[in-house]
Amino acid sequence: MITLALSKGRIFDDILPLLRTAGIEVLDDPEKSRKLILGTNQPDLRVVLVRATDVPTYVQYGGADIGVVGKDTLLESGSQGLYQPLDLQIAKCRISVAVRQGFDYAAAVKQGSRLKVATKYVAISRDFFATKGVHVDLIKLYGSMELAPLTGLADAIVDLVSTGSTLKANHLIEVERIMDISSHLVVNQTALKLKQAPIRKLIDAFSLACAQAAAKQ
């Protein structure tokens, strides 16, 4: 049995077409079912639903053999012991710095001001600003990032940006793009040795599905 760890939401929705192309159908709709372990039309493959931030942990410690996770989560939480064979090119977005309209971010950086930055990406933010030589105080938040500059909690935020519509709706502007993000396939190293044939077959199926999806774009 191969266990594939997925998270609900955009990654799950975006992976479904790739699964179908690979000949895999998930038998339950996670939006309608309370099940956390879902069967598939492949008797030797099941799906477990976990929080996005927990996918690397499940794969690393053997709760799942293989998983799909955003590059942001891998960079933030660490990916020790994980084999990363494939960028699936799904759930694309970016991590960016944003500030409230009217805040002169460029001037603050040039003057060497110490900025308060709210984010859930503390490690990524720390590395980014350190590389630029910008002095920051990082404030860890878990949601509603856009509120931080509007309430005076922070001068800037570092967060995922897709279309930018949420920033615009809250009178924030994107001032720096830190990196582009997409979802990657991750594999437990021990599982790869013990279940090499079925896991390699699954990786190859995903690779072919990605190539076919790219050809249609």
Swiss-Prot record:
Lineage, opening ranks: Bacteria, Pseudomonadati, Pseudomonadota, Betaproteobacteria, Burkholderiales
UniProt cross-references to HAMAP family, sorted A to Z: HisG_Short
Identification of the protein by name: ATP phosphoribosyltransferase
Keywords: Amino-acid biosynthesis, ATP-binding, Cytoplasm, Glycosyltransferase, Histidine biosynthesis, Nucleotide-binding, Transferase
PROSITE patterns: ATP_P_PHORIBOSYLTR
Any one GO BP annotation for this protein: L-histidine biosynthetic process
Quaternary structure (record): Heteromultimer composed of HisG and HisZ subunits.
GO molecular function, one term: ATP phosphoribosyltransferase activity
Group of enzyme by EC: transferase
Domain notes: Lacks the C-terminal regulatory region which is replaced by HisZ.
